[in-house]
A protein has these predicted regions:
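N-terminal amphipathic/basic leader segments beginning at the initiator methionine
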Residues: 1-8
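Mg2+-dependent prenyl diphosphate-binding active-site environment of isoprenoid biosynthetic enzymes
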Residues: 11-212
Length: 212
């Protein structure tokens, strides 16, 4: 991850904070989200440096969200390894994940041109709200023993998985002349991969395996 630190906080202290995050990124997944962003660049045609920044933001958000997911799901394994909170504790893992969320926002603020900053922050906020709405409803149904309707489930899936997809594409469009609305395609992709992930979790002998 980006090693730049603030004047008030040195690199050594930061490394102590983000040990759970560094632990999970050592055992990387397939980086599907990065591949998807690169695929969209076939149409959007943004520069390599901007693409690199956006890809980094999405991967950081995804990996930090996994730290929280494992706590919320009472998981014991992630990608075949013990979950971070079983090693570093719940409190430190939550703090590390939240810290990375704000590091992503800070990276966006530092690297994006000032003239598009308000739009970028608005997109960042809206898409993370969508992600947490989807995750929140998923948790609510699970803990309340409520079986959602098919439409409610589809809405949850599109928020939960489509949030990061949408964030990446919309940030890219801030630097692109292609302003077509990709929302429907993003929703379809999010729906496909979340349903596939849920199905694999139900059928797999190892429900903790992370496939994406």
């Amino acid at each position: 991850m980006d090693q730049e630190t603030t004047d008030q906080f040195n690199e050594s202290d930061e490394e102590k904070l983000i040990e759970p995050y560094n632990y999970i990124v050592q055992n990387v997944g397939k980086k599907f989200r990065s591949s998807l962003i690169e695929a969209f660049n076939f149409w959007l045609q943004i520069s390599d440096d901007k693409l690199r920044i956006i890809t980094n933001i999405i991967e950081m958000l995804h990996n930090s969200s996994l730290l929280i997911d494992d706590i919320e799901d009472n998981a014991t394994l992630r990608r075949g390894q013990p979950v971070a909170h079983s090693i570093f504790g719940i409190a430190k893992t939550i703090n590390a994940a939240n810290y990375i969320y704000f590091r992503c926002l800070n990276l966006l603020i530092k690297e994006f041109p000032e003239e598009i900053m308000p739009k970028a922050v608005k997109i960042f906020t809206e898409q993370l709200l969508e992600l947490h709405r989807g995750q929140g409803m998923d948790i609510y149904w699970r803990d309340s023993f409520v079986c959602p309707s098919e439409q409610d489930y589809m809405d949850m899936v599109q928020r939960k998985t489509g949030g990061l997809f949408g964030l990446g594409v919309k940030l890219m469009q801030l630097f692109s002349t292609d302003q077509r609305n990709f929302s429907y395609l993003i929703k379809l992709l999010g729906t496909y991969f979340q349903i596939r992930d849920d199905y694999i979790n139900l059928k797999s002998a190892s429900v903790s395996q992370d496939y994406f």
